[in-house]
């Protein structure tokens, strides 16, 4: 009875979140000169704070998937690899993270285009909820080829019919990356050589749409003779004139692709992780911009709830949040995944920016 009550509460919450809100996720991938790979992404939800937390999962930890209607007996899996993930709503719903083998995985909303297989109670033992798929991937695999081989052995479902479907990005330490989209009840696995992912439409469509922007170039367009007058750019950056700036998934995909592709390659994976946060600043969604007039979310500083970068070379997870833009890090090398206990903690212990006063020479220090 207690587990069914828990299911009902979680299903209601995630159903409301996915059905009624505006959500926007933007992901990029950077590779450094030292052969390091960094994946980074934002997560947006502008209705309310999503109970964001980080979760540490040890080796050998056993999880069982939730199922529709509060059914029990979902896919049970034990962690071959320890991992760290950023979760929403409850600790097992890891949205993005990395395991000790350097495999990164993330969930991105995919409304209107995904179609999971119809839930069949007779297949409960190999059925997993979409919000637990990242945990399954991080706990069981070290390469994208392993994930590719296993993904169609399970059945992915949503615990609430109102919820949006999702698609997933998986990257390993070699830089290999795949996108998983479930349509017509079957997983389609795409090699992702570009490294960018947002939301709907489907990934092949997003790639084709890039062809609309073949005219964009980095830098400044040169002067053009226009009859008797000479046309000149007003300022730097005119080569990107026409780059989409709105918050729709296709526009964010194009913008992320161009900013990622033309950003300067960094020397180290650490530098790439720092660069990723600068790039993703372009995708912060100011609170209220995705809503109709009069529908104003309250008690939140931003619709971009958090941003994460996973450094698969150094095995460090970095994040900041809407409450505190100061970067925090979790070094997987310093975690004994054989002995640490499963645990989960809020991303912010204090919901306030870290502001460091500048001490002015000669000014009083007691203020």
What is each PLM-predicted segment?
Residues 24-38, 46, 52, 150, ...:
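C-terminus-biased signal that marks the final domain/tail of proteins
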